[in-house]
Amino acid sequence: MDVKQNYEQAKKQYEKWGVNVEDALEKLKQIPISIHCWQGDDVTGFEVNQQELSGGIDVTGNYPGKATTPEELRDDLDKALSLIPGMHRVNLHAIYAETNGEAVERDEIEPKHFENWVKWAKENGLGLDFNPTLFSHPKADDGLTLAHPNKEIRDFWIRHTIASRKIAAYMGKELGTSALTNIWTPDGYKDIPSDRLTPRKRLEDSLNQIFEEEIDKEYNVDAVESKLFGIGSEAYVVGSHEFYMGYALKNNKLCLLDTGHYHPTEMVSNKISSMLLYSDELALHVSRPVRWDSDHVVILDDELREIGLEIVRNDALDKVRIGLDFFDASINRIAAWTIGTRNMIKSLLYALLTPNEHLKQLQEEGNFTDRLAIMEELKTYPFGAIWDYYCESMNVPVGESWLTEVKEYEKEVLSKR
């Protein structure tokens, strides 16, 4: 049987549960994933005076073909996007500014330094999201930025983040889709602090200054991102989950949950419903932590499936901004983007094909036997046949055939860098 015939057979199995497969695929087409540019160059960026990666994060591996120019990075993103079904977004960090060889300090970056990104996004029908880069810089060498006791250093990072919001607003206005400005700062201490409160007061004050200027949400939406620990901030991180959850709710900002920024057994999927009870919107960075925030490529594991289910079953497709955040330099970087993004979309399709209302009803009735049995049986339903049909209908490679294109691109382009 061909892809269409397999699809028709699979469709019947889902329809017996009352699942409208065609509606599910139409909904899937409308869900943008914000794809992080930094997988393509190992979080290096294009600053004239480049610094070693810092901020308690790490990239391991040395696979050949890494992008070293904006043009190479956009070409690589073009290739990955051609293998991923749907219309999506690209997430940029401030270090991806294009300054034509001029050394521009981070507190002096402007929209003009991202004109090429906006032009490219327009040509490709993409949205853009943005992040101030509060790491890999001499003024972040001691692990403190927005919570730094030195006002001069603190003010530098405040100016940088204010500039970043303006850049994001420019992107949102130009592209007709609001950009998400996500603030993550590595501030913390390696060993047990003698004062946990004062740095948090400073961070709160810095954020208040950053958000002083109101920006139309049609162009820019602000998010804040917590973290449990990083390399060099094992004992204490200023921007903890509780800090940012409180700040976001009090100040009407989005809380961004990164799946690698919690205890290894703490699941972000378990937080989504609670957050949505008290916040109109929520943002995610979907990653894969292996024993720590290792940022492995996202796979279709239980947690990813649960994240998709929580978004879909709670009617939150228009309330959750889904972004990815992983970087693996040990494998082909275009393959990493493709694997991770396709898996994120697969998790959403799996959720859309689940008879969620029926399963909810079983739970309300206390019928936990049927609930468990059906949830487990659905795992071996012909979901793959629906996925293949979706890929074919969206004119992207079916199954693992995309690997052939990646290998050809590696041979013709990446190997010559």
UniProtKB/Swiss-Prot annotation:
Leading EC class: isomerase
Pathway assigned in UniProt: Carbohydrate degradation; L-rhamnose degradation; glycerone phosphate from L-rhamnose: step 1/3
GO molecular function: L-rhamnose isomerase activity; manganese ion binding
Predominant subcellular localization, coarse grouping: cytoplasm
Enzyme Commission code: 5.3.1.14
Amino acids binding Mn(2+): 261, 293, 295
Positions of transmembrane segments: none
Keyword Amino-acid biosynthesis in record: no
NCBIfam families: PRK01076.1, rhaA
Family: Belongs to the rhamnose isomerase family.
Stated name of the protein: L-rhamnose isomerase
